[in-house]
Amino acid sequence: VPRARLLRPAPPGEADHAVTVRRAGPADHAAAVALAVATFDYTGLVAAPRRANTADLLGPGLRAALDEAEPAVWLAEEDGEIRALAHCAWVDSAPGSEAGELLPAGRWGYVNNVVTAPGERGGGFGRALMAHVHRELHRGGATRTYLYYNPTNPLSSVFWHRQGYRPLWTSWEVRPAGALR
């Protein structure tokens, strides 16, 4: 279910324990891929099964994102250990453009993948990370943000609602397609 969020300047929040958030770089590729794969390990339990080559599929896109001058990838750390990742992008929507078919005109922040390391979920890392990421997307010119999430994931539906996201549009699918018969 795609969700959208109107981006407003965030009030300064209290830091969750000693969480620090930083922009990721090329040296973080292996850790970023490992965290991104952890998303699919979890959603594979509640949605479509995870593919054995998930890391191979995600690696090149993360490499390209991390090689950008200012990657839209952030990491939350505690005591120097990476606990969470947010892989995002900026999307410019204009009438007649591909993005314009789905989004109102303007500069959008796209939240592609957010994951907290297994065993760390519920510890405030995702909340601290996204507070920082929303501010950074706003500074980068985004006036709104959007994301897609899997409604069968019981963690994401609660998390994103608490982050202020509301439905922009809804799409449904059935797997396998033969189940429609």
Spans of model-derived segments:
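Conserved glycine-rich acetyl-CoA-binding loop
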Residues: 117-128, 140, 152-157
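Conserved GNAT acetyl-CoA-binding A-motif
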Residues: 1, 137-149
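Conserved active-site alpha-helix within GNAT-family acetyltransferase domains
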Residues: 1, 127, 151-169
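Conserved beta-strand-loop-alpha-helix junction that forms the acyl-donor binding cleft
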Residues: 146-156, 173-178
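Acyl-donor-binding surface of acyltransferase catalytic domains
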Residues: 1-16, 169-177
